[in-house]
Curated annotation (Swiss-Prot):
Entry function: Transfers 2-(5''-triphosphoribosyl)-3'-dephosphocoenzyme-A on a serine residue to the apo-acyl carrier protein (gamma chain) of the citrate lyase to yield holo-acyl carrier protein.
Keywords: Nucleotidyltransferase, Transferase
The protein, known as: Probable apo-citrate lyase phosphoribosyl-dephospho-CoA transferase
GO molecular function: holo-citrate lyase synthase activity
Family matches, as InterPro entries: CitX (IPR005551)
Family indicated by similarity: Belongs to the CitX family.
Taxonomic classification: Bacteria, Pseudomonadati, Pseudomonadota, Gammaproteobacteria, Vibrionales
Gene: citX
EC number(s) from the headed UniProt entry: 2.7.7.61
GO terms, biological process: prosthetic group biosynthetic process
Catalytic activity: apo-[citrate lyase ACP] + 2'-(5''-triphospho-alpha-D-ribosyl)-3'-dephospho-CoA = holo-[citrate lyase ACP] + diphosphate
Pfam families given in the database record: CitX (PF03802)
Length: 178
């Protein structure tokens, strides 16, 4: 993966973007009074906006649309953002409950070929993020060794290069076979 140096992202830029995203989430919840899916891509390293992250975002948005068609849930509003910090989306979905919506998003994360690269947060109308633990689901597994992903990330068990090579392989395989 080659990268343009201007697209490198610092930790400060990531944290600032997260603050802005939280504010935007609040505005969306106020405007629609329905659960909100806040979709970001899990991409290690300093380059968050690349072909692989775009492939993951496109695949995730298709999966959400297919879910809505299959369940009869209505997608009320949607916004895609292409930020230097990576692609993002806000999707307001009229589902029976935020917890049912979270279970459906976790199913996408679990079963979609690129699901492990998707971060599909569900925020209820009161602004609370519904967590994996709250839904009694295990934490994410590492892409490379199947251990707890949080532990691998904190200990830097794998190099960014090894993780990016795996992501490149996953998105290539998906693009070829989808």
């Amino acid at each position: 993966m080659s990268h343009h140096p201007d697209l490198s992202v610092s930790l400060d830029q990531l944290l600032l973007r997260k603050e802005v995203r939280v504010r935007q989430q609040g505005e969306w919840l106020k405007r629609h009074s329905l659960p909100l899916v806040s979709f970001t891509v899990n991409m290690p390293g300093a380059f968050k906006l690349n072909a692989a992250s775009q492939t993951v975002m496109d695949a995730g948005m298709r999966a959400i649309q297919e879910l809505c068609q299959k369940t009869g849930w209505r997608q009320v509003a949607c916004q895609l953002l292409v930020e230097k910090t990576g692609p993002e989306a806000f999707v307001v979905i009229q589902a029976p409950s935020a917890s049912m919506l979270k279970k459906a998003m976790m199913k996408i994360e679990r079963e979609h070929p690129l699901g492990r690269l998707m971060d599909l947060d569900v925020i209820d109308v009161d602004g609370h993020i519904i967590s994996r633990q709250g839904a009694q689901l295990p934490r994410r597994r590492c892409l490379l060794c199947e251990r707890d992903a949080v532990i691998c990330a904190r200990s830097r068990r794998h190099s960014v290069e090894a993780l990016l090579a795996k992501i490149e392989e996953m998105t290539h395989d998906y693009s070829c076979c989808a």
